[in-house]
Amino acid sequence: IGMVFQNPDHQILMPNCRSELLININQNISQNEINKKIEYVLDQVGMAGFEKRPVHTLSGGQKQRLTIACALISNRNFILLDEPTALLDQTSQLKVLKTIKNLTSDHKKPLSALWITHRYEELTYADAVAELKNGFLSSWQEPSKFQYN
């Protein structure tokens, strides 16, 4: 399971973006493939060209996008995201949500994503909505049928 926490500072361990991504990638591939994967995931989260950037120079939103890139590069079949767009501006939120949707819709590589959100507008990117009330599952339905109470 790939994980993305709400606060990226609780997840980032390495001094720059490339080294953070490297600890999440399968090392049994060629250096050329590693470089391609790093470029691809950074582009997917709007951070193309950031691979050598020191983590301490990143904004909170950039750190969050880096953690999402780390989850994507790990080639997991399931990603759990705890409010992955919480620290992002609206443009970055949309890019990340579209990326997650595109990746989960790609039938060549099965990927499921469960993300926790308090933002009603994010539901349109989901295939299903599970609502929790008082710690229990209270409903499971299509996003178009969900009504916020």
What are these regions (language model features)?
Residues 71-72:
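ABC ATPase C-loop
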Residues 79-83:
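Catalytic Walker B motif of ABC-type/P-loop ATPase nucleotide-binding domains
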Residues 54-58, 62:
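Conserved ABC ATPase signature
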Residues 136-149:
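Conserved beta-strand-loop-alpha-helix hinge in the C-terminal portion
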Residues 32-50:
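Conserved ABC ATPase "signature" region
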Residues 90-92:
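Helix N-cap at the start of a conserved alpha-helix in ABC-type nucleotide-binding domains
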